[in-house]
Curated annotation (Swiss-Prot):
Membrane topology: Lipid-anchor
Lipidation (N-palmitoyl cysteine): 26
GO cellular component: cell outer membrane
SUPFAM superfamilies: Prokaryotic lipoproteins and lipoprotein localization factors
Residues in the signal sequence: 1-25
Gene coding for it: lolB
Organism of provenance: Shewanella baltica (strain OS185)
Organismal lineage: Bacteria, Pseudomonadati, Pseudomonadota, Gammaproteobacteria, Alteromonadales
Function in brief: Plays a critical role in the incorporation of lipoproteins in the outer membrane after they are released by the LolA protein.
Descriptive protein name: Outer-membrane lipoprotein LolB
Cell compartments where the protein resides: Cell outer membrane
Any GO BP annotation: lipoprotein localization to outer membrane
Family indicated by similarity: Belongs to the LolB family.
Record bears the keyword Repeat: no
Length: 214
């Protein structure tokens, strides 16, 4: 059984179990207590954010759909995939120098999150570039192929590793005061990812009022 089929089976099993248990045992990420929701006028102003949405992964042999929850900051990332009923089936927690993946009751570790995810799941997902694309930004290895009438990227090619990633920004939305993508489609060879951001929240340090102790 290939890795994607194994993960698909895991998600289906968790979905069935959660239906029987009426959501008993659902897991959630601990809150980032040092960060609070903020409003920005440009997504580039947010050094940290969290999102909720849906992720679809498709290969010639299989396909997978899951809810995605992602908290991102410059120091760490916390990514979770769940069934439609909310049961956690995969968590990936990482810092610039370490990564921990929990899936199917097993724990895996590496010093690189992207390499770890590819080794265990078989997915070559550009985790280092996704935070830029999720906020509508373009990286140094990205070549913009087309822009919309407002100058936002509509399609780009990432040339860092062959074959290149083709990224399409299908729609945009206003979240936390900024314009961010609503739907993204990523293609590389025979691997296709679709990401829908249902909620994107910019995060920052809580403001300290005059007279309060820091």
């Amino acid at each position: 059984m290939n890795n994607l089929k194994r993960l698909t089976k895991t998600i289906f099993s968790c979905f069935t179990l959660s239906a029987l248990l009426l959501l008993a045992g659902c897991e959630t990420l601990p809150p980032m207590t040092d960060l609070s929701p903020i409003t920005v006028t440009d997504a580039r102003q947010a050094t940290a954010w969290e999102l909720q949405g849906k992720l679809a992964i498709k290969t010639p042999d299989d396909k997978l759909s899951a809810n995605i929850y992602w908290r991102h900051s410059k120091d760490r990332d916390e990514l979770t995939l769940t069934t439609m009923l909310g049961t956690t089936v995969l968590t990936l927690n990482s810092t610039p120098n370490s990564a921990h993946l929990h899936i199917d009751g097993k724990d895996f570790r590496d010093d690189n999150a992207q390499r770890l995810l590819e080794r265990v799941s078989g997915w070559s997902i550009p985790l280092a570039d996704l935070p830029l694309w999720i906020t509508g930004q373009v990286g140094p290895n990205d070549q913009v192929i087309a822009r919309d009438s407002q100058g936002k990227p509509k399609q780009l090619t990432n040339t860092q590793t062959p074959p290149p990633w083709q990224v399409a920004f299908l729609s945009w939305q206003s979240q936390s005061g900024a314009s961010v993508p609503h739907q993204l489609k990523l293609e590389r060879g025979d691997l296709q990812l679709k990401l829908q951001l249902n909620q994107w929240q910019a995060l920052g340090k809580p403001a300290i009022l005059v007279g309060e102790q820091p």
